[in-house]
């Protein structure tokens, strides 16, 4: 006769805590295993290794050379004069969204050269 999983679960449910602990010890000895929960170490390490691949170029402030910054925003985004001015006037805000690291670094350098304060996120 075979014992079903439900029968085993019902039998364990009727046991006291001490009996369950003794049962676990018996399982560990019989099968050479431990009932300890596994650590999440390797998964956490893998998360640390992941590198950010997409960046947002944030214009923090235009600085004193606002016209140059507007020109730089137009050059980087392809926006018209009115739209680029709105982006610069609306600082802090995103100039470019989800761009590669190289493009983000170039955009940051261009905007900083024009006189803006920029941050990559």
Curated annotation (Swiss-Prot):
Protein name: Large ribosomal subunit protein bL12
Keyword Ribonucleoprotein set for record: yes
Assembly description: Homodimer. Part of the ribosomal stalk of the 50S ribosomal subunit. Forms a multimeric L10(L12)X complex, where L10 forms an elongated spine to which 2 to 4 L12 dimers bind in a sequential fashion. Binds GTP-bound translation factors.
CDD domains in the record: Ribosomal_L7_L12
UniProt GO BP: translation
Family (UniProt): Belongs to the bacterial ribosomal protein bL12 family.
Tree of life domain: Bacteria
Keyword annotations: Ribonucleoprotein, Ribosomal protein
Classification of source organism: Bacteria, Pseudomonadati, Pseudomonadota, Gammaproteobacteria, Pseudomonadales
GO-annotated molecular function: mRNA binding; structural constituent of ribosome
One Gene Ontology cellular component: cytosolic large ribosomal subunit
Job of this protein: Forms part of the ribosomal stalk which helps the ribosome interact with GTP-bound translation factors. Is thus essential for accurate translation.
Native source species: Pseudomonas syringae pv. tomato (strain ATCC BAA-871 / DC3000)
